[in-house]
Amino acid sequence: MNTQSTPSPQFYLTAPAACPYLPREMERKVFTHLVGPRAAEMNDILTQGGFRRSQNIAYRPACEACRACISVRILAQEFEPSRSMKRVQSTNSDIIATEFPAQPSSEQYSLFRRYLDYRHQQGGMSDMTVLDYAIMVEDTHVNTRIIEYRRREEGSGLEQRPKGELLAAALTDVMSDGLSMVYSYFNPDLQDRSLGTFMILDHIRRTKALGLPHVYLGYWVKGSRKMDYKTRFQPQEHLTPRGWERFDPADAGEDHSR
């Protein structure tokens, strides 16, 4: 009897580059391609092992002199929103969230462009074109969805794509043990809505409804202001050399009780 074995993934190492989070540090990444019939399975395994997905690439930091990037996942079934998070939910009660297959639109790109121009003018994504955005959304071999968040208007919910202004969107992988937030963006003019927080809360709600345990938020870097928000969602686990361990919010040097 002839049997065919699936080739093991090949891993590669990037050249050193300036770290986007910590000054004077250099970053390197180890990566592999997520293609073929086992792409979804490999994405699950690698994400659970601290990798992140970007298009058809799974990567994780492999820096020579630094271990500051820590993988974070929320324990969705145990999560209870704080008072401030409940206020965010109330503020955004006029938003309707709709899940679609991972397909880009010009409306999405327009909002994405506004977000980049406001938040990441000097970042590596700052010059992304509409084609780059389309590739970011569509180039996936796993179960990827895009969730649109729109201001609710009369008639919303009666059509396949609800009416109302697009305020935010999230590119999300559906995994065997939860949801992984690949990339999210929002209208930067609506700071009072805390749309980034609202999208994470919505992903926790969706994960609970699916009966799954985890929402993956990517990497947290202690001391990086860009990353501080991630430790507000408790309880959560951090990936350590000993495996996933529950994180004590006091270690972040912040008060998360409000």
UniProtKB/Swiss-Prot annotation:
GO molecular function term, any single one: arginyl-tRNA--protein transferase activity
InterPro entries: Acyl_CoA_acyltransferase, Asp_Glu_LeuTrfase, N-end_Aminoacyl_Trfase, N-end_Aminoacyl_Trfase_C, N-end_Aminoacyl_Trfase_N
Catalytic reactions of this protein: N-terminal L-glutamyl-[protein] + L-leucyl-tRNA(Leu) = N-terminal L-leucyl-L-glutamyl-[protein] + tRNA(Leu) + H(+); N-terminal L-aspartyl-[protein] + L-leucyl-tRNA(Leu) = N-terminal L-leucyl-L-aspartyl-[protein] + tRNA(Leu) + H(+)
Keyword Acyltransferase: yes
Compartment(s): Cytoplasm
UniProt keyword list: Acyltransferase, Cytoplasm, Transferase
GO cellular component: cytoplasm
GO biological process, one term: ubiquitin-dependent protein catabolic process via the N-end rule pathway
Enzyme's top EC category: transferase
SUPFAM superfamilies xref list: Acyl-CoA N-acyltransferases (Nat) (SSF55729)
Enzyme Commission number: 2.3.2.29
Pfam (any one): ATE_N
Function: Functions in the N-end rule pathway of protein degradation where it conjugates Leu from its aminoacyl-tRNA to the N-termini of proteins containing an N-terminal aspartate or glutamate.
Stated family: Belongs to the R-transferase family. Bpt subfamily.
HAMAP family found in the cross-reference section: Bpt
Protein name: Aspartate/glutamate leucyltransferase
Species whose genome carries this gene: Rhizobium rhizogenes (strain K84 / ATCC BAA-868)
Gene that this polypeptide is encoded by: bpt
